[in-house]
From Swiss-Prot:
Keyword 4Fe-4S (UniProt): yes
Cysteine disulfide partners in this protein: none
The name this protein goes by in its record: Biotin synthase
Organism this protein belongs to: Pseudarthrobacter chlorophenolicus (strain ATCC 700700 / DSM 12829 / CIP 107037 / JCM 12360 / KCTC 9906 / NCIMB 13794 / A6) (Arthrobacter chlorophenolicus)
Residues that span the membrane, as ranges: none
C-alpha cells in the first residue's frame, strides 16, 4: 500500500499562484511558508526550485566582490565590522587600481560574469568616485566582465556618472524590514536607502538589493522584508545570513538556525519568482556544505564565490565543483550596456 504524502495548503496555493501563474506570494502567505514544520521543508524547497527553473532558467550567475575601501565607515549598521563607531578589528584600508585589476582577472578566471567594487562609506566623495572611474576604465581594458558597484547612498549626479561609465549593476541592500530597520541602523533611514534604489533603477542600471537575515527579526518581519523587496522589483537579491562579528552590537546574536535559513530561501523565491536570488555572506556557517547544496536545489540561482568583504567564504573551487555536481551551467558573460 502506498503511504499517503501529506500536503500543506500554502504550498498547493503557491504551486498554482507562483509556479503556474508567476505571481509572487503576499506577505501573509509568506508568513505561512516561514511557519511550515520541518517535515514540509523538502516540499517547499522542491517547489521553489521548480519556480526558479520555470521563471529564471537553469543557469547560475557567479560573481566575485572586492573592497576598494575597507573599514572606517561613519554609519552604525549594528551587524557591520566596517563601522568606525565600533570597537571591531577592521581598520581603514584603500585598494589601489592595479590590485583591483588583478582581483577582476582572478574573478573572471573562476568563470564569474560579474565583478563588484565595494566601498565602506555612507556615500562616495569626489576622491572615491574618481578612483572608481579609473578602476572601471582599467578593468574594461584588460578583463571581459560586467562591473557592479556598491558605494553607499548616491546623489542623482553620482547615479548618472556611474551609469555613464558603464556600471552594469548597483548594489544597495535594504538589509531588513522597514519595521525592524531602526533597531539595527540609526545614522540613516530606510527611506534614504529606497531613494538611492529608485534613482539607480530610473538610470537604467540593474538594481541589486539584498537582505541580511538572523539579526533578531521575527518571522513576520522576514516576510515583510521579502514583500518589500518584491515591491521594489530588483534584478537581484543577495541573501546574507548574520555572521556575528566581534566588537559589533550583534556580536552575541548567535547563528540563524539552518532550517529557518532554508525556509527563508524558499519563501524569498516564492515571493520573487523571476529575480536573481544570490547566495551571499554567512551561508558557510549557517548552512554548511549540505545546506548550501539544499539551497541551490531550493530556489537559489546565483552565488558569490571566494571571500566576502571582511569574512572568509567557501573556496571558489568548492562552489564551482558543486555547480558541476548539480549539473547547473554557469551563465555565459553577456555585456548588456
Amino acid at each position: 500500500m502506498t503511504p499517503t504524502v501529506h500536503t500543506w495548503p500554502i504550498l498547493e496555493t503557491a504551486r498554482t499562484q507562483v509556479l503556474e501563474q508567476g505571481i509572487g506570494l503576499t506577505e501573509d502567505q509568506l508568513v505561512e511558508v516561514l511557519q511550515l514544520p520541518d517535515e514540509a521543508l523538502p516540499q517547499a524547497l522542491e517547489l521553489a526550485h521548480q519556480v526558479r527553473l520555470r521563471h529564471c532558467g537553469e543557469d547560475v550567475e557567479v560573481e566575485g566582490i572586492v573592497s576598494i575601501k575597507t573599514g572606517g565607515c561613519p554609519e552604525d549598521c549594528h551587524f557591520c565590522s566596517q563601522s568606525g563607531l565600533f570597537d571591531s578589528p577592521v581598520r581603514g584600508v584603500w585598494l589601489d587600481i592595479p590590485e583591483l585589476v588583478k582581483a577582476a582577472k582572478e574573478t573572471a578566471a573562476t568563470g564569474a560574469t560579474e565583478f563588484c567594487i565595494v566601498a565602506a562609506v555612507r556615500g562616495p566623495d569626489i576622491k572615491l568616485m574618481n578612483q572608481v572611474k579609473f578602476a572601471i576604465g582599467r578593468i574594461n581594458e584588460e578583463v571581459d566582465i560586467n562591473i557592479a558597484c556598491s558605494l553607499g547612498m548616491l546623489t542623482q549626479q553620482q547615479v548618472d556618472q556611474l551609469a555613464g561609465w558603464g556600471v552594469h549593476r548597483y548594489n544597495h541592500n535594504l538589509e531588513t524590514a522597514r519595521s525592524f530597520f531602526p533597531q539595527v541602523v540609526t545614522t540613516h533611514t530606510y527611506e534614504e536607502r529606497l531613494e538611492t534604489c529608485a534613482m539607480v533603477k530610473a538610470a537604467g542600471m540593474e538594481l541589486c538589493c539584498g537582505a541580511l537575515l538572523g539579526m533578531g527579526e521575527s518571522l513576520h518581519q522576514r516576510a515583510e522584508l521579502a514583500a518589500q523587496l518584491a515591491a521594489l522589483e530588483p534584478h537581484e537579491v543577495p541573501l546574507n545570513f548574520l555572521n556575528p562579528r566581534p566588537g559589533t552590537p550583534l556580536e552575541n546574536q548567535g547563528l540563524m538556525d539552518g532550517k529557518d535559513a532554508l525556509r527563508a530561501i524558499a519563501a524569498f523565491r516564492l515571493a520573487m519568482p523571476r529575480t536573481v536570488l544570490r547566495y551571499a555572506g554567512g551561508r558557510e556557517l549557517t548552512l554548511g556544505d549540505l545546506g548550501t547544496r539544499e539551497g541551490l536545489l531550493g530556489g537559489i540561482n546565483a552565488v558569490i564565490v571566494g571571500n566576502y568583504l571582511t569574512t572568509l567564504g567557501r573556496p571558489a573551487t568548492a562552489d564551482l565543483s558543486l555547480l558541476v555536481d548539480l549539473n547547473m551551467p554557469i551563465r555565459e558573460l553577456q555585456k548588456t550596456l
